[in-house]
Amino acid sequence: MQYRSTRGSKENTLTAPQAIIQGLAQDGGLYVPVAFPQANFKLEDLSKLSYKQIAAMVISLFFDDFTKEQITTAVQSAYSEQWDDRSIVPIEKHDNHFYMELFHGPTLAFKDIALQMLPQLMTRAVQIEKIAKDIIILTATSGDTGTASMRGFANQKGTDVIVFYPEGGVSPVQLKQMLSQRGNNLRAIAIKGNFDDAQTEVKKIFNDDSFKNRLNANGYQFSSANSMNIGRLVPQISYYLYTYGQLVRRQEIKLGDEVNFAVPTGNFGDILAGYYAKKLGLPIKKLICASNENNVLTDFFNNGVYDKRRKFHLTNAPAMDILVSSNLERLLFDLYDENNYEVASLMNQLTQRGHYQVSGEVFTKLQKNFAAGFATEEEVKSEIKRVYNYDRYVIDPHTAVGSFVANQYQKKTGDQTPMVIVSTASPYKFPETVYEAITGGPSMQTGVGAIKELHDELGGQLSIGVRALFDREPKTEKIIEPNDMEKEISSILDLK
């Protein structure tokens, strides 16, 4: 299968391994299939397949340059003993909603689903393409991607990981995870600014030809672990298919019944994977885009205008503290019938003016497939408390955003289609907020201390990923200005 840029010519294509290695297109666009694949499965098959089988099926569908053996071994390595639940994605039913738990991997967040797989794909892609250079994984993070990419690529030969995150813009647990990851090829550096500042600078560095020439001369090549990388996005399609199959298997729904998914959304990768699952034939009625107070996407889906010219909020759901959602570009490419000129024009408007408006036809398509809402910080805490009071089920702040917006949507529309909440992180990643929500009083601790405090309140057994946090001492945090990121990379790699 061939891949093209959302902003480039249909004739300028790459193979899947090339797209995975390159990460971001040279014109600033994102890689998408030249022809979206036809499903290689029947809907009734999904209830009979394990998560690993569905993951292998999806990867072989989108990345057919890899052999069956390469995909099988990649899946086995990605979804092995590092997961604390053998099913990989357990589904819990609470208060008439289904919670798709994506946080049972080593770093306690949904990013593990893709970032345990991406290093496997990257290794095999490098072998296929016979790349002699070391791969530099350059990534901006709002918290979870940094941790998960560092864990996934730790000590991988021929690969270095450089992560930039916003100072004060990640949770204490996320910070400790990044600063205590073990591996001699890992770096995490704070920038003075927010996630959008980090991501914007990363994109600029990716497209700086003179800097890339210096890298090449020193034996290095950039790639990315953000969901901008198609190798990171595709594995996420699997859990939508798996969840639907499990609901059929458990007789919660009948084969062919429609399902809604409420997705806590920041950079738009997770919900885009759901849209791709729908394009493959999964009976999804609505994808509900759930935002925190950085509600640029809520406004976009409700009025067709994307406008980043607004106050940036640091919230208790920090992984969603984003005003520029990169993967939305892939959706626009699809809804504009793969018109790369329209997409490039919209992205230029966003860069130059800070806003754009989609056509009436595209807005109609948005309304057909999506709904949107947001939750304030107080509503997040109230939702955690409400869900806990119902049957002692504990959710993290991001999942609470999804749950709150799902309920808001159902009350507004009366739509009683079965609802799946995409549960994106363990509550122990954000113990301060969860503790305050459940007890009504502030946590007296932060980080690991707050985990102990929350565990004392909740009881039960801590997962492997949570217990690992108690054993590691973090490195000293390094903080730089965003415009010094390129200089920092040069220093780390000792570029001549």
Give short role names for the model-derived ranges.
Residues 1-496:
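PLP-dependent amino-acid enzyme catalytic core
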